[in-house]
Curated annotation (Swiss-Prot):
GO terms for molecular function: ATP binding; damaged DNA binding; DNA helicase activity; hydrolase activity. PANTHER family: ATP-DEPENDENT DNA HELICASE HOMOLOG RECG, CHLOROPLASTIC. It is found in: Cytoplasm. Residues 808-969 form the Helicase C-terminal domain. It comes from Staphylococcus aureus (strain MRSA252). A motif (DEEQ box) lies at residues 747-750. HAMAP family: TRCF. The gene is mfd. This is Transcription-repair-coupling factor.
Amino acid sequence: MTILTTLIKEDNHFQDLNQVFGQANTLVTGLSPSAKVTMIAEKYAQSNQQLLLITNNLYQADKLETDLLQFVDVEELYKYPVQDIMTEEFSTQSPQLMSERIRTLTALAQGKKGLFIVPLNGLKKWLTPVEMWQNHQMTLRVGEDIDVDQFLNKLVNMGYKRESVVSHIGEFSLRGGIIDIFPLIGEPIRIELFDTEIDSIRDFDVETQRSKDNIEEVDITTASDYIITEEVISHLKEELKTAYENTRPKIDKSVRNDLKETYESFKLFESTYFDHQILRRLVAFMYETPSTIIDYFQKDAIIAVDEFNRIKETEESLTVESDSFISNVIESGNGFIGQSFIKYDDFETLIEGYPVTYFSLFATTMPIKLNHIIKFSCKPVQQFYGQYDIMRSEFQRYVNQNYHIVVLVETETKVERMQAMLSEMHIPSITKLHRSMSSGQAVIIEGSLSEGFELPDMGLVVITERELFKSKQKKQRKRTKAISNAEKIKSYQDLNVGDYIVHVHHGVGRYLGVETLEVGQIHRDYIKLQYKGTDQLFVPVDQMDQVQKYVASEDKTPKLNKLGGSEWKKTKAKVQQSVEDIAEELIDLYKEREMAEGYQYGEDTAEQTTFELDFPYELTPDQAKSIDEIKDDMQKSRPMDRLLCGDVGYGKTEVAVRAAFKAVMEGKQVAFLVPTTILAQQHYETLIERMQDFPVEIQLMSRFRTPKEIKQTKEGLKTGFVDIVVGTHKLLSKDIQYKDLGLLIVDEEQRFGVRHKERIKTLKHNVDVLTLTATPIPRTLHMSMLGVRDLSVIETPPENRFPVQTYVLEQNMSFIKEALERELSRDGQVFYLYNKVQSIYEKREQLQMLMPDANIAVAHGQMTERDLEETMLSFINNEYDILVTTTIIETGVDVPNANTLIIEDADRFGLSQLYQLRGRVGRSSRIGYAYFLHPANKVLTETAEDRLQAIKEFTELGSGFKIAMRDLNIRGAGNLLGKQQHGFIDTVGFDLYSQMLEEAVNEKRGIKEPESEVPEVEVDLNLDAYLPTEYIANEQAKIEIYKKLRKTETFDQIIDIKDELIDRFNDYPVEVARLLDIVEIKVHALHSGITLIKDKGKIIDIHLSVKATENIDGEVLFKATQPLGRTMKVGVQNNAMTITLTKQNQWLDSLKFLVKCIEESMRISDEA
């Protein structure tokens, strides 16, 4: 974009503006948004000061930011995103917007140069005093000394929460001399101390908890946009007490108890940890002199104001909204007199003392003394939309008038295409920049702005893809580091105290934790389980593989088994029988698939390559991998049966479109089967748009087509004239004949009925099948894992997707009104989810009274199919602003313009449902907002809290596939293998059921469990060898380490575990060292055929297997063990060698030495 700024800065009109910009109050009129951005960016480039750009709302700030990213380095561009002050202060929310706010405040507090975009809401919001914010900026360096207590206190002040293990943003932990911190910005950090000196700083992976790279220094940013110190709390207590006493007599007696509860709920008087999320709503009482963001700017900052009159309008409505909101919360006993979130001073007063440059598209009167008025003449560019003749004549006019013509396109391929097109029109053009660009020619460069513009006085025109081809601007990739490492999903197998478990031999019990018991003066760790009545079972941690978490249907509370009874054996036998029947079916499926003969496609054609280059976006790595896997399948003779699992809007359709094109290029027909008429229409339009430049005949079969058109399509399929047909279950009718069907694409297969699924099954025999799904239902997920189907997963989001901002809050009409107004003010649409059909029309009336000017429609499952489709289509076509709907929108509706979702009674929904519903918004380059409301004063069930907590955690894009696993944890396995299996899964739990099924399938396939070369080794030594609670306090971490130790088979794995222990928990004590020694002995024993090592008090007994006895080289063994002298004796028992070792000082080392010698004499024997 350098060419554009070069042309502008050399122009006299800009130079006039540049002289007064930031020097005196100036009004600049006539510039379109993109032209204005170009001027502001050039002014910023030429100055050394901070530049503040104020907009009327966040939507406008987002739009200007997208254009500014073309000119300003991403590291120097900042935004202070405040969407809706009241909602943000009263709800639990996603961390992304807060991390952007913190990044901005931190840069300002450090005096960094930057271009800062701040919406009016952000300008007026109360903030922590600047000095306090500056005092809480921390940079840690290796070699420095820190006061640990003071440092941890500061972390708490900054909004961090102490946990035993860090797994979420905003947490820290202390284990010995190791401090872990997960900041809002950047990677999780591990600081290792040597006494008070920082010995090392490393970033680490929250999933594995392992360190990655060493770092010399790190900035620790706050985890909240408020700092709350003990002094702040002390001031807050006094102010709040006064506010409470002032408010109580002035409110209705009926809500005084509610006010008392509200007052006490802040727990200011007995808590040691203060919840920033709750206290932020008391910001007006926190600080003696709170700041606003203006106080953070340097005194010589340049200020630009975008559309003053719009800002004044927004300010008026913000004041009214704020007053009304505060009145509501006071009247309902949820707030106090004096509570506020914004500074009520006029906008002009806030920026008093700074020379301000006001930008306005039209000349306007303003209540401000202006020193200069600069008028630009700026015209919009003619919209060509691909019309060749109009384009040619307009370009010719620019050439004749000696204009500088700048053409912006988004990819290198398009630059080449555009030059070829202009060459055909005989328009001179260049694509490489020279020192000076001569007028009367076009320069085509990679770049994008939201719109083109013409500046006649400058002789400059900028033309974008929007004018050329009606393309929308691709949103520039921004910093993603702040959110890239956000929530990683923990295993759905994580055990918490109180969880139900299944012991393979004893049945369903309850997990009560890990307990260290002393038996015969030896300490060991055991897993404590509760069974029916008072029965308890202590399972040694080395047998923990026999214990699994119980996972089944969400509403199923399992019955505890009795220890020692026959009930569990009978249950398992029943399940075994049913599992064997299912295994039989699966094997038949598998055999059919292996033996079936399908069409074998060739390598990609030249047309395929051209078609793929046409895709305007860059593929994500997962998309590319999935495409390769699908093509590999198509190029085999066996028919493809692949499940493509990817989150909503992750580009599954593009993958399917490429497979369809490949099939068509080899003369095959493609059927694209979808569950709804509207989805059929949307996929049809996508295919038409993608394949418009290629000779591919695409038709649609749905109720939107006339009988005559349907008849023609059927005829075309029979004759081969139609290449691709998109449709609903009509495609499965018996009367449809294909000339040569090669590929069947099925979208959301689980939404089809049994009859349709059967028909799909018959088509699968010799046709390639690709199934698309956003949330894999466990059945499909599991079948894929069993190898009956292949699985491809798209987990990476497209570049321009931003996680949906998720708020969880109490139901409140003020919040709802603000959320609706915010979305409609940016010309967007809203899904309002209300899942009670009987009162849905009353809800519509209620919303209509709230929003009299909005067009509101209703959609629910009891409407006729035709009415429902017509309503949905009208909503998609932007004829309605708000759609009040039930969960029928859960899947398959794509409304890119609907970017706000409000769900009433969100606590009643299952997790995968909430996730799917949230996937309806945030599908364009705009940020999406989801508000999950739960009734005020309602105590949520633990499961509902779990669900809402999980959905808040998974604000990262792409948690869909993993959520299916988490969903098994919360919602249960559901109908995993059809209804008849449901009860069996509930009886034994999902994991044991799956294990039994897999074993049955393998047995019937003739696949034997890989038998170990040597039998299981039993090592029983009278030693304190365990993980003490003082070393690892967190039980889940403890279980995780025990599991790793149990699975250890090589010395490299032992070294890895030692490194992990030191990395995560610091140097280990003697009990842990012995535990590692025992594991090392076990590994030697595994490789040498030892079956038992038993401590018998004064001696250690060692038994070898018969096979090992035959293979051992006795001579080598005796020579190697000479240092042990008479402490070692050898004998034979049942044709197997036994060795006894007399215990003396350092006997554990002697045992390690002996076992190692046995292994070596075995290896030498093998080599001989």
